[in-house]
Amino acid sequence: MKEVIMKYVVQNAAKYGKASEKAVMGKVMAENPELRKKAKEVLELVKECITEFEALSEEVRKELIKKYSMDSEAKRELETKKLPELEGAEKGKVVMRFAPNPNGPPTLGSARGIIVNGEYAKMYEGKYIIRFDDTDPRTKRPMIEAYEWYLEDIEWLGYKPDEVIYASRRIPIYYDYARKLIEMGKAYTCFCSQEEFKKFRDSGEECPHRNISVEDTLEVWERMLEGDYEEGEVVLRIKTDMRHKDPAIRDWVAFRIIKESHPLVGDKYVVYPTLDFESAIEDHLLGITHIIRGKDLIDSERRQRYIYEYFGWIYPITKHWGRVKIFEFGKLSTSSIKKDIERGKYEGWDDPRLPTLRAFRRRGFEPEAIKSFFLSLGVGENDVSVSLKNLYAENRKIIDRKANRYFFIWGPVKIEIVNLPEKKEVELPLNPHTGEKRRLKGERTIYVTKDDFERLKGQVVRLKDFCNVLLDEKAEFMGFELEGVKKGKNIIHWLPESEAIKGKVIGEREAEGLVERNAVRDVGKVVQFERFAFCKVESADEELVAVYTHP
């Protein structure tokens, strides 16, 4: 019991400087509701623990704060966010796959597939395969850099694939299965134009090429592979049911001619499989046991089941989930982002205004936060609309405990404190969770934000942990004590001229001004600019540059 109470005493004291009996009692009772009957006894223990903690040396208090760090609490919370069990899953026998098209870097939307499939592989001690579905060198043309970007971001999110497959390097395998289907009479070469075949498809009639002999079909197929035909002249179709209630399932295209150099395999091939064909073959060959994908791909399963039926294969257990719409990003496609980068609207794929994982990494998001965010959404079939504020909340739980605090004065206004009796070294919290401190010089020439100056000019304000002044360009010193200033109401942050350096924040929220010199030691880390936002310090050369993380 005492151990539990001391944990909350330490956490509360670390956060607020002094432990509150009421706050600690609330935490203890929430964790152990059965103790409500013994509230008086528990309160006495709380008082005792607070007294004991306050009597400890600063060094011992720091050690206790580390011991009871709320990072472990955040990890426990993440562990409780479990996915529902997979139908028909057995430990050690589950094989999951994440199959992106590498036509750009992974986005926040990609993270959902990476995380959910990766978590199920971990949950069942199974196998996790990353397969690049990169067999469209034109419409969804792969970016050569994106292959590596995907692998980097997958590792950053905490997953190590057991196998990495590049579909474009396995095209002869798909040719072999296409030939088998032709020989079985289940696929045919079709010379109809798109418009002509649409008429047959919509009316449910067979096109004239459907019943050409296997021998003639094989001859056309070989000529396709040799490059004898032009793009759009002929395709290979899978025979399904031309009377199927869904026209999209009727004799779908399995291979088409694309005379375009591929970033990975060059000009080696001119006939490429469609995603539905390639994916169907690979899922079988790789032994995929479960597929989790968007409900917009239900037709893909219906098409692919024809191939599985023809070969006598068992289709993987499939679960379709609803779309996730994130309000703040709207409909940003990879192709539109690429155009905007080329036009100079964005500086690159890691521009902090973009929804790419590279951008979120640059902003200082923790992978555990992204993981927690998506696990909380689950894998239901209903569409979900969600705000980035939910992700911010998850990230804040983690970074708030690690981020050092500094002052950033955006739109600085210079102030001279009149009648300041002496320079004073001011001690401020560096990290309230660890009890560490930082120091600033309390001197006559300081800076405050333009916002604060215009809002509070002519009023008595408290310069945080320093002194009280009557705010003006020539600010009258009003004492060092907190008395006379409404608690929290007119407390503003400030910077001494001697410890201010140029700084700016870039990204979703941009600002320029002056930054506390102490912040240069945190390059590469997320900090909290008090009363502004969490930001990741990116560089500190001629000026300090920080990337906006979130409020």
UniProtKB/Swiss-Prot annotation:
Q: Which GO terms describe its cellular component?
A: cytosol
Enzyme Commission identifier(s) = 6.1.1.17
Which residue numbers does the motif 'HIGH' region cover? Answer: 100-110
What reactions does this protein catalyze? tRNA(Glu) + L-glutamate + ATP = L-glutamyl-tRNA(Glu) + AMP + diphosphate
Top-level taxonomic group = Archaea
Question: What keywords tag this UniProt record?
Answer: Aminoacyl-tRNA synthetase, ATP-binding, Cytoplasm, Ligase, Nucleotide-binding, Protein biosynthesis
Any one Gene Ontology molecular-function term assigned to this protein's record: glutamate-tRNA ligase activity
Note the InterPro entries from the entry: Gln/Glu-tRNA_Ligase, Glu-tRNA-synth_arc/euk, Glu/Gln-tRNA-synth, Glu/Gln-tRNA-synth_Ib_cat-dom, Glu/Gln-tRNA-synth_Ib_codon-bd, Rbsml_bL25/Gln-tRNA_synth_N, Ribosomal_bL25/Gln-tRNA_synth, Rossmann-like_a/b/a_fold
Which residues are listed as membrane-spanning? none
Where does it reside? Cytoplasm
CDD domains from the entry?
Answer: GluRS_non_core
Q: What biological-process terms (Gene Ontology) are attached?
A: amide biosynthetic process; glutamyl-tRNA aminoacylation
Q: List the disulfide bonds.
A: none
Question: Which NCBIfam families does the UniProt record give?
Answer: gltX_arch, PRK04156.1
Summarize the protein's role: Catalyzes the attachment of glutamate to tRNA(Glu) in a two-step reaction: glutamate is first activated by ATP to form Glu-AMP and then transferred to the acceptor end of tRNA(Glu).
In which family does this protein belong, per the annotation? Belongs to the class-I aminoacyl-tRNA synthetase family. Glutamate--tRNA ligase type 2 subfamily.
Which protein is depicted? Answer: Glutamate--tRNA ligase
**Which gene is transcribed and translated to give this protein?**
gltX
